């Protein structure tokens, strides 16, 4: 498909004008069909969950703040009724059902959704090395990975990653604490405080004036020249993806504890901010495994970086970048500032994702301020992308397509997945808050 031909498409023209759009995915095929395209299944997610469990004693020792959750890194699921009322008042549109916030923004260690996938891939690599060199067995107490002799062993190896910020933060901190030498290749969008935090752990931060794609490519290139360097590939990694996917079974458990039903008459809608796609893609995969066709997964992207929407809509996936259409990929949502989506995630998930929408930067600041005022919860701009999702779902076309009745909608649960912000320094947060209009 020629780019010139694409530019004649009225929907693409809206993207090129940076208009906010909503697109209901006609390729969405139901869980039975959709899962067959992924190339992974529930046993892979279960293995990831078991690996995280094996590392629980390690976390209790290395990060004492995780002791209260017995070494399991999991985020709170909280009701945001005041925010719901404020959204209804401000947008003059109904939100039926309950509105909850999944606070991955406040996950331990790195304060973002990347504490799921990024940390998991570092653990998988550390475990592989430790098992191969007979330092541990799978039945051992993994807290011994804190011992100096094992840290010395890991220091012979290095890890590299390209990132807009949060993935680098999770991999950098986790890798450094285990003893690895870590290099994080940071794109121009990365926040200064994230670079400083990494340096405080002894991580080598390599800065670029270009965007995310360049940082990843350079990280990959640097790792190739060193046989002891492991490159974590945010664009193609199934290991990262599986780390995120464990969120599905964890959420199911939280629902059981909170008495929240998900079935035909109690649909679940989850709104996930999307950058390159690994985090939201992996979480959506886990959600579909856990809740089947009763969960609807909607991706939210900035108007200036709609890479996954563009890839899935055109079917070109990683063969097209937003810049090919003159879209600049410059956004306040630094975690979502990605011009070319993951080809792996796009192809794996295009039959499981129910919809996409875009949101302008100013709304992210407005919603950030509103959440702070109503619920006293502070997030970074990227994390607010999902907040207007429930307003889009009221669209009659969406309800018709999925045969959702008003009664089912009244029983629905909406989850806004808050992807980051828990570690933002106060000075930076005050800047964000000053940019909101209400």
UniProtKB/Swiss-Prot annotation:
Which branch of life, at top level?
A: Bacteria
Q: Does the keyword Lyase apply?
A: yes
**One annotated GO molecular function:** hydro-lyase activity
Q: Which reaction does it catalyse?
A: D-serine = pyruvate + NH4(+)
Cofactor(s) recorded in Swiss-Prot or TrEMBL: pyridoxal 5'-phosphate
First-tier enzyme category under EC: lyase
Q: What is this protein called?
A: Probable D-serine dehydratase
Which InterPro entries does UniProt cross-reference here? D_Ser_am_lyase (IPR011780), Ser/Thr_Dehydratase (IPR050147), Ser/Thr_deHydtase_PyrdxlP-BS (IPR000634), TrpB-like_PALP (IPR001926), TrpB-like_PALP_sf (IPR036052)
Return the NCBIfam families for the record.
D_Ser_am_lyase, PRK02991.1
- Tell me the PROSITE patterns matching this sequence: DEHYDRATASE_SER_THR (PS00165)
Q: What is its EC number?
A: 4.3.1.18
Family indicated by similarity: Belongs to the serine/threonine dehydratase family. DsdA subfamily.
The PTM N6-(pyridoxal phosphate)lysine maps to 114
GO terms for biological process, alphabetical? D-serine catabolic process; isoleucine biosynthetic process
Q: Which UniProt keywords apply?
A: Lyase, Pyridoxal phosphate
């Amino acid at each position: 498909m020629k780019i010139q031909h694409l530019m004649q498409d009225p929907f693409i023209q809206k993207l090129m004008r940076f208009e906010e759009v909503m697109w209901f995915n006609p390729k969405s095929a139901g869980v039975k069909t959709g899962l067959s395209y992924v190339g992974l299944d529930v046993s892979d997610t279960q293995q990831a969950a078991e690996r995280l469990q094996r590392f629980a004693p390690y976390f209790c020792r290395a990060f004492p703040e995780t002791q209260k959750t017995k070494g399991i890194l999991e985020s709170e699921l909280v009701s945001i009724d005041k925010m719901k009322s404020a959204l209804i008042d401000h947008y003059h549109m109904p939100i039926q059902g309950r509105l909850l916030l999944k606070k991955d923004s406040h996950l331990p260690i790195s304060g973002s959704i990347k504490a799921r996938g990024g940390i998991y891939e570092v653990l998988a690599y550390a475990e592989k090395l430790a098992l191969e060199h007979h330092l541990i067995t799978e039945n051992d107490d993994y807290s011994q990975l804190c011992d100096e002799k094992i840290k010395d062993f890991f220091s012979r190896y290095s890890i590299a990653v390209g990132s807009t910020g949060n993935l680098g933060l999770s991999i950098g901190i986790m890798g450094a604490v285990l003893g690895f030498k870590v290099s994080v290749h940071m794109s121009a969008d990365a926040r200064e405080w994230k670079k400083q935090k990494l340096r405080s752990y002894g991580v080598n931060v390599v800065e670029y004036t270009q965007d995310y794609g360049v940082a990843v490519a350079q990280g990959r290139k640097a790792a190739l020249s060193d046989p002891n360097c492991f490159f974590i590939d945010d664009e193609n990694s199934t290991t990262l993806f599986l780390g995120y996917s464990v969120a599905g079974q964890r959420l199911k458990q939280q629902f059981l504890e909170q008495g929240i039903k998900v079935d035909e008459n109690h649909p679940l809608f989850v709104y996930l901010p999307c950058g390159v796609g690994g985090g939201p893609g992996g979480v959506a995969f886990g959600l579909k495994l856990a809740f089947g066709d009763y969960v609807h997964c909607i991706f939210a992207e900035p108007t200036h970086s709609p890479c996954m929407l563009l890839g899935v809509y055109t079917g070109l996936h990683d063969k097209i970048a937003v810049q090919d259409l003159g879209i600049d990929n410059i956004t306040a949502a630094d975690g979502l500032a990605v011009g070319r989506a993951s080809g792996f995630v796009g192809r794996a998930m295009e039959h499981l994702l129910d919809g996409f929408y875009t949101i302008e930067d100013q709304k992210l600041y407005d919603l950030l301020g509103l959440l702070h005022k109503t619920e006293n919860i502070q997030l970074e701009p990227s994390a607010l992308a999902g907040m207007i999702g429930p307003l889009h779902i009221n669209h009659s076309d969406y309800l018709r397509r999925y045969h959702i009745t008003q009664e089912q909608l009244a029983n629905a649960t909406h989850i806004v997945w808050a992807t980051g912000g828990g570690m933002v320094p106060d000075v930076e947060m005050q800047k964000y808050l000053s940019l909101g209009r209400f």
